[in-house]
């Protein structure tokens, strides 16, 4: 199960920034590369407020090395996705600005498992289980788990 996975760079990220990020991560790994706006997590203002108030959530910028490692992981996942043979569920909000919904589409189309499900929640933000349609998302997740759990 993959919930709004980071499988492709965002379409709004300039290509020069992607190329430069690897260089910066080597020479200045702690460089504060990008800040994540909590307002992009959910359309539910209570979820956004809870995130901003949570002392256990990192509110600083993502270091350049972390960003470069995520980009490298994306490439490894893309190269190996056709070897995956277990049941796969991917779900993503179509208005996610933190991770790219097109990455989930491409992964869903290219994964090797014949048992694959891609669900896109129209208008949904990054945290689909904490967004406005959370009940629908959770119900679909539970139904998928029941369909894939061994009978006992």
What are these regions (language model features)?
Residues 58, 95-99, 127:
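Acidic catalytic loop of the alpha/beta-hydrolase fold
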Residues 15, 102-103, 132, 136:
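Generic recognition of short, well-ordered alpha-helical segments
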Residues 1, 89-91, 119:
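Conserved hydrophobic packing residues within short motifs/helices of P-loop NTPase cores
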Residues 62-80:
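Active-site nucleophile elbow and catalytic-triad environment of alpha/beta-hydrolase enzymes
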Residues 1-62:
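Alpha/beta-hydrolase-fold enzymes
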Residues 115-152:
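Catalytic active-site module of serine/aspartate enzymes centered on a nucleophile-bearing elbow/loop
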Residues 84, 90-92, 96:
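Short beta-strand/loop motif that positions the catalytic acidic residue
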């Amino acid at each position: 199960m993959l919930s709004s996975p980071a499988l492709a760079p965002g379409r709004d990220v300039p290509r020069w920034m992607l190329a430069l990020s690897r260089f910066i991560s080597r020479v200045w790994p702690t460089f504060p590369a990008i800040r994540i706006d909590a307002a992009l997590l959910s359309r539910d203002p209570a979820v956004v407020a809870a995130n901003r108030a949570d002392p256990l959530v990192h509110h600083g910028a993502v270091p350049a090395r972390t960003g470069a490692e995520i980009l490298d992981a994306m490439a490894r996942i893309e190269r190996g996705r056709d070897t995956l043979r277990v049941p796969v569920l991917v779900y993503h909000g179509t208005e996610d600005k933190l991770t790219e919904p097109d990455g989930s589409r491409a992964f869903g189309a290219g994964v090797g498992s014949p048992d694959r499900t891609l669900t896109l929640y129209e208008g949904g933000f990054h945290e689909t289980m904490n967004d406005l349609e959370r009940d629908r998302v959770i119900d679909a997740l539970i139904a998928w788990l029941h369909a894939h759990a061994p009978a006992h």
